C-alpha cells in the first residue's frame, strides 16, 4: 500500500478514536478533578508520594475526584460517606481488583485472595481461608505459641536493658510478628533459639521486603501499555526475578512438608490430626477443585504468600508506629501503664484474655491507625460495571484509590489532626463497651478495609499488635536513646504498599516489674 495513503488512514483512525472518546466523556457526568494531559492524563501530576497528591486533589475538588491515569479511569476519596458507598452499599460493583503487572507476577497470576479479581476462584480461595485456616478454633490452638513468642520478646528486651544497650524496635517487633506467623503457617520460627537458622531467616525477610516494595509501586506500564516495551528502570525484570525467588522459596517449604507427611505415613503415624497441623499441612490435606485429590501447589503457594505478607509487615509496621508515638508522648505511656497495672497488676504477665479490657491501649492503637495506617491506600478496587456515586457517572473498570492516610487527617472529620490524642476514641460513657480496633459504622478509620474485601486475617492481626504492645508497655518503661528528648523522635515515613518509619525506631528499655518476672535470662531474637 502507498505509504502516504497508509499515513492518511492511520491519522484518520486516530482522529476518529480520539473524537469518539472525547464525545463519550462529554456525555458522561464524571466527578470533578484536575486538568488532564493528552495520553498521560494526570500521571505527570503525581510525585513520589501519590497519597499526598491525591489528598490535595480531594481538598481542592471535593470528596470524590476523577483522574485519568494514562489509559485508566480512576477515582479517589478520603471521605467516610463515599467510602461507605463504595465498600458497603455498592460492594457488588466495586469488590473486584485490577490485574496489575505486579499482581500477575507476584501473586501467582492474581490467584490469591488479596489481589485476585472478583470471581469463582477468589470465592473458593477465601472460603479455604475462612473455613480451614482462620477459624476461631484454629487461631486459639496457636495461643500457647503466641504466648511463648511474647515471652521471648520480653526476655530479649530485658537482656538488652541489663546490658545497658538500646533496643532496635523494628528488628524485635519484626521478629515477633514473623515468628508468630511462620509458626502457624510453616511450623517453624525464623528468629530465636529454636529458629530455622540465620541464613534462611534473612532470605525470608529479604524476599518479603522486596515483595512489598514491588507491590507498592505505581508502575507506569499498568497505565501506559507502551511503557512496558521500554521499562527503562527494569521494574518488570525485577518483578520476574523476585517472582522466581518467591516461588522457589515457597516450593521448598511445600516439598519439606510433603516429605514429612510421607515419612509419617511410612511410620504409620496419623498425619491428618488437624489440631497439630500447621497451615501448610492443612492445605496439603484439602481436596482440590473439580474432583482433584489435592489442591494445586500454585494455589497453596498463593495462600502462603497472602498469609505471610498480610500478617508480618503490616503488624510490625503498626507496632513500630505505636511505640514511636507513645515514646514521643510520655503522658500516654503513663496512662497505658496505669491501665495495665489496674487490669493485670505486677504479679503476672499480660494474657490474651486481658486484651479486651485494655480500653486505653486499644484507643492508642486506633489513634495510631488514624495517623499512621499500615498502608497509604487500601489495595485498589475496580468497578465491574458502570454506576453512579453522588450523582456522578463512574465507568466500568474504573480503578478506586481509597486514601486511608488522608482519611485519618481529614480536617472535615477530625480536629487537631497532627496531635496524637488517643482520648478522642474513648467511649462516650464508662460502660460504652469494648473499643473496636477495626472500622466502626462511621468509617473514620479503616485499618482492615470492609465489605467483601475486608482482610480475613484481621482478628489475628489485632491480637499480634495488642499482645506485643501490652507486654512491652507492661514490662518496661521506655525513653529515647541518650542525648535525645521525646520530641526528637522522628516520624518521617517511607511510601510503599506499607508505610514504615523512614528510620528504624531505637529506644532504651527500663524494667518495671520484679526481676523474677522476666525469666532467668534473655533469649536471642
From Swiss-Prot:
Compartments it resides in: Membrane
A Pfam entry, by short name: p450
Reported phenotype of the disruption mutant: Male sterile. Defective in pollen exine and anther epicuticular layer development.
Record GO terms (molecular function): fatty acid in-chain hydroxylase activity; heme binding; iron ion binding; oxidoreductase activity, acting on paired donors, with incorporation or reduction of molecular oxygen, NAD(P)H as one donor, and incorporation of one atom of oxygen
Reactions catalysed, as given in the entry: dodecanoate + reduced [NADPH--hemoprotein reductase] + O2 = 7-hydroxydodecanoate + oxidized [NADPH--hemoprotein reductase] + H2O + H(+)
Keyword Aminoacyl-tRNA synthetase carried by entry: no
The protein's enzyme class: oxidoreductase
EC number annotated for this UniProt entry: 1.14.14.130
GO biological process: anther development; lipid hydroxylation; medium-chain fatty acid biosynthetic process; pollen exine formation; sporopollenin biosynthetic process
Transmembrane segments: 3-23
Record keyword Oxidoreductase present: yes
Membrane topology qualifier: Single-pass membrane protein
PANTHER family: CYTOCHROME P450 98A9, CYTOCHROME P450 FAMILY 1 SUBFAMILY A POLYPEPTIDE 1
Family: Belongs to the cytochrome P450 family.
Protein name per Swiss-Prot or TrEMBL: Cytochrome P450 703A2
Organism: Oryza sativa subsp. japonica
Gene responsible for this protein: CYP703A3
